[in-house]
Amino acid sequence: MALSYSRRLDQLHRLNGELAEAPDKPVFTDGYVLSGLLSKFKICFDVSWKLMKDILVGELGIVDFPKGSPREVIAISAYNGLIDDDEMWLEMLRLRNELSHIYDGDAAERAARAVMDHYIVALANFEKDMQTREGRGTPRRP
């Protein structure tokens, strides 16, 4: 578990660093950059919920996931205090699922706006909290 947790935390750190660069990029004028942002978001979200599951199973000993789905992991993570805002995480999950079916530019731009306005910060805060949990960093300020 420690190796998986540590590896996922390192991946999350790298991905969050890349997402943090989005405001400096031509996201809304370059389709390639837009698509890259949305792809990075999907990967970052997936690494995050899998990191939650690693902690729930490895540290908290919770192994009775009927499905092990992201929705279930988010709910159990909120209950156990790993995340504060399960509604935002469920919104991110919905967006992640919808991205596979977005084919028009306007919908992609709306998705990118949500990522840039809300989800980049939420993912970065989650990473900081997990870094602190692992003893790698200082806690974020509310």
Language-model segments: what does each one mean?
Residues 1-142:
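Solvent-exposed interaction patches of small proteins and small membrane subunits
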